[in-house]
Structure formats: C-alpha cells, structure tokens
Design a protein with these regions (language model features):
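Metabolite-binding pocket within alpha/beta catalytic cores that recognizes anionic/polar moieties
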Residues: 1-138
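His/Asp/Glu-rich mid-to-C-terminal helical/loop segments that flank catalytic regions of hydrolases
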Residues: 219-257
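Active-site rim beta-loop-alpha module in soluble metabolic enzymes
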Residues: 130-187
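Glycine-rich beta-alpha junction loops
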Residues: 27, 95, 156-162, 197, ...
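Generic non-transmembrane alpha-helical segments
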Residues: 138-146, 201, 240-251
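Zn-dependent metallopeptidase/amidohydrolase metal-coordination segment
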Residues: 196-230
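Short acidic/polar active-site loop segments enriched in Thr and Asp
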Residues: 86-87, 189, 208
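Flexible, glycine/charged-enriched surface loops at secondary-structure junctions
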Residues: 40-44, 147-154, 250-257
C-alpha cells in the first residue's frame, strides 16, 4: 500500500483531512465536535473510525474517532499521518485517581504510564510516553482561560477497563492492586486507555500530540466517602480542545511568517 493511497482502516485519502486532527475515542462524539468547525463535512465511517473535516480560523481541521484502547488509536494516528496529518489532540474521558480530581474537572496529561502494550511495538519500555510541550501548553492555557478546574500531570494508561474496576476477578489481582497503590503514591492524576500509545507513536512518527480529558468520576474519592457525583457531559473538555487547537493554528502561522 502506498502511503498516499486510500488508507486500509480509516478509508481516507490525501486531501480528506487537515494537518490538525482531534482524536476522541467515541465515534458518537465526532459530529458534536465537528459542529465547532466552520463548514463541517462528514468524510465517512469505517469500523470505529468516524471522520469529519471542516475549518477553524480558515485552517483545514478534522476529527477522527479511535475506538477504545491503544491498538486502534495507533492505527488511526499512523493512517492519518500517511495522508498529511501532523498535529493530534486527544480528547476523551478519564477516571480520577488523586483525591483532588473531581467529576467535571479537566485533566491535561504531561506524561502517561505505559501500563499497556501497544507502545512496546514502537519504543523500548525505557522511553517515556510524553506529549508535545507546545500542544500541552495550549491545552493547559485553554482550560484555564475557559474557567475549568484544570489539572496538569501524569495519567495512567491501561489495556483492561475491568482490570481497574473489578481487579478482584482477575487471577493476577494482587499485581493489579499493588500497581494501583503505586500510582496513587506517585501522585498520578487519572486513568484512561489511549494516551501512552499515542504519545509514543507520535514520537516514532515525529509528529505532535497532546491529551485532555473530562473526568467522569473518581473511585478513590468514593472509597474515601467523599462527595462523588458522576458527570458524563464531555462538552467542557471538547471546548478546551477546540480553543487549544485555535492557539496552535495561530502560533504555527506566526512562526511561518
């Protein structure tokens, strides 16, 4: 397959997407994200990959869902890069770990624990999963300027959702629980499932990537008997992502002059 041909999984070709791409996990969120674009057009959907393209500040931008977990997210990034994308902003949901992380807060990742295996196909375990600094700074600034309670720090990435939420069912429950205790003691902010893979794949490809998350809930606060509502409205994190993307577009234009 030639890199500029129709991509095997996302079914897109060169010209279908912009250089800037937002990466939610849920295909159902793509249309609502695209409504923040000017003149959004549905490019297509195959498997978990739902793709829309439009414009922000006159710049061509896209949104492509990745599904759940590292393998499908890595495929999306590789195929989007094949047809011209070079800046990726993941927006999704997470569960809080640190006790000060509340539902409806926004978390911006400064690094990701590689408690998954997709990234090992791209870099040895000694290599850190870290986002692009400029993308991360734009996400942090956008969250704060929009008035969201924005946390910045390390997130944990996993392959098994139920390994976190029902570890006692696993034959290796003791390992899962010990690791979880380590994450807590190390001040990890939240848990999700894609960023470690995306950060390492981005490094391997030489592209930019950053992540921000909407906090759904915090199981550690619940265990501690603290106030713990649940929040599934991701619109805040999406707005943060859109504003961060505008900042990046403006910054890139200024550097190009």
């Amino acid at each position: 397959m030639q890199e500029t041909e129709k991509q095997f999984h996302i079914h897109c070709t060169e010209g279908d997407v912009g250089r800037y791409v937002i990466l939610p996990g849920d295909p159902g969120r793509c249309e609502s994200i695209a409504q923040h674009f000017d003149n959004p057009v549905h490019i297509g959907m195959n498997r978990e990959y739902n793709i829309w393209t439009g414009y922000l500040l006159g710049e061509k931008v896209s949104v492509c869902s990745t599904g759940i977990g590292g393998p499908s997210a890595a495929i999306a990034m590789e195929e989007l890069h094949n047809i011209g994308a070079d800046t990726f902003l993941r927006v999704g949901t997470c569960g809080g770990i640190a006790l000060d992380i509340l539902p409806d807060d926004v978390v911006v990742a400064t690094g990701a624990i590689r408690y998954e295996h997709t990234s090992m196909e791209y870099a040895p375990i000694e290599f850190p999963a870290v986002p692009d600094f400029e993308v991360t700074a734009a996400l942090k600034a956008a969250g704060e300027e929009l008035g969201y309670n924005t946390h910045v720090g390390v997130v944990q990435c996993k392959d098994s959702f139920y390994g976190q939420h029902s570890p006692e069912k696993s034959p290796v429950y003791y390992e899962l629980l010990n690791k979880w205790e380590s994450w807590k003691r190390l001040g990890v902010k939240a848990s999700e499932m894609e960023s470690a893979a995306l950060f390492v794949v981005a490094a391997a490809l030489g592209v930019r990537c950053g992540s921000c998350f909407h906090v759904i809930w915090n199981q550690e606060r619940e265990k501690a008997g603290l106030f713990m509502p649940m929040s599934e409205d991701t619109s805040g994190a999406i707005k943060v992502c859109i504003e961060a993307l505008k900042k990046l577009i403006e910054s890139d234009r200024a550097k190009a002059k």
